[in-house]
């Protein structure tokens, strides 16, 4: 049995290319075994509140010192952490928005990157606790950011690899769907390449 966590984040909904291919990959992975499970969080349709003073205080306090409001905030964050830790495979879909990830995805990260739960500090440095997971990132972009002159503007993939690695998730595969603003032929080529890559990865899993 494999537990799959699908995180989609594009505010474009059904028109989103990253949502489409992340969903397709997660679906193909789930279909490999009847015992596989799939949990889907759509961060645009059901946004996770950004960190505020209540939530920040809640995750820093022992449970018996929290106010009622802080307990609710901590329980919500704990649920997200539990979903992540239970997953064997994580599929993340995001568009490249102003050279980085969607803010809703950042909010999810801020809730699951928790000291003592998904990482810990030691005398020799931080240690990730969310280990043993395969992560797939589907990144959609209007331009081309996987290579060429604009690669340095792609802050999304380096950031995601850094923060995921910090939590112990180092086996990361990136699927680019890019050049989507370069006309119909470019879109057709990008979509075909993404479809082939999704099929390849699903078969290899």
Curated annotation (Swiss-Prot):
Q: Which cofactor does it need?
A: FMN
**One Pfam entry name:** Flavodoxin_2
Q: What class of enzyme is it?
A: oxidoreductase
Free-text cofactor note:
Binds 1 FMN per subunit.
Catalysed reaction, written as an equation:
2 a quinone + NADH + H(+) = 2 a 1,4-benzosemiquinone + NAD(+); N,N-dimethyl-1,4-phenylenediamine + anthranilate + 2 NAD(+) = 2-(4-dimethylaminophenyl)diazenylbenzoate + 2 NADH + 2 H(+)
The UniProt annotation places FMN binding at: 10, 16-18
Question: What EC numbers are recorded for this enzyme?
Answer: 1.6.5.-, 1.7.1.17
Concerning Gene3D superfamilies, the annotation shows: 3.40.50.360
Query: What molecular functions are annotated in GO for this chain?
Result: electron transfer activity; FMN binding; oxidoreductase activity, acting on NAD(P)H as acceptor; oxidoreductase activity, acting on NAD(P)H, quinone or similar compound as acceptor
Similarity comment: Belongs to the azoreductase type 1 family.
Q: What does this protein do?
A: Quinone reductase that provides resistance to thiol-specific stress caused by electrophilic quinones.
This protein's assembly is summarised as:
Homodimer.
Query: What name goes with this protein?
Result: FMN-dependent NADH:quinone oxidoreductase
Q: What is the lineage of its organism?
A: Bacteria, Pseudomonadati, Pseudomonadota, Alphaproteobacteria, Hyphomicrobiales
Gene this protein is translated from = azoR
């Amino acid at each position: 049995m494999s537990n799959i966590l699908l995180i989609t984040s594009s505010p474009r909904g059904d028109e989103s290319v990253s949502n489409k291919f992340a969903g397709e990959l997660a679906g193909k992975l789930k279909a490999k075994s009847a015992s596989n499970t799939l949990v889907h969080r759509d961060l645009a349709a059901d946004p996770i509140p950004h960190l505020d003073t209540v939530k920040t205080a809640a995750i820093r306090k022992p449970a018996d010192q929290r106010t009622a409001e802080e307990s609710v905030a901590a329980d919500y964050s704990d649920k997200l952490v539990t979903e992540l830790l239970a997953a064997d495979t994580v599929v993340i879909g995001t568009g490249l928005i102003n050279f980085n990830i969607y803010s809703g995805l950042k909010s999810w990260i801020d809730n699951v990157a928790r000291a003592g739960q998904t990482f810990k500090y030691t005398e020799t440095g931080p240690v990730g606790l969310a280990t043993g997971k395969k992560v797939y990132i589907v990144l959609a972009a209007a331009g081309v950011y996987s290579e060429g002159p604009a690669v340095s503007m792609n802050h999304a993939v380096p950031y995601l690899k850094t923060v995921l690695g910090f939590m112990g998730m180092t086996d990361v595969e990136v699927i680019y769907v890019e050049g989507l603003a370069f006309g119909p032929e470019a879109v057709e080529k990008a979509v075909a390449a993404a479809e082939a890559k999704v099929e390849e990865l699903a078969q290899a899993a």
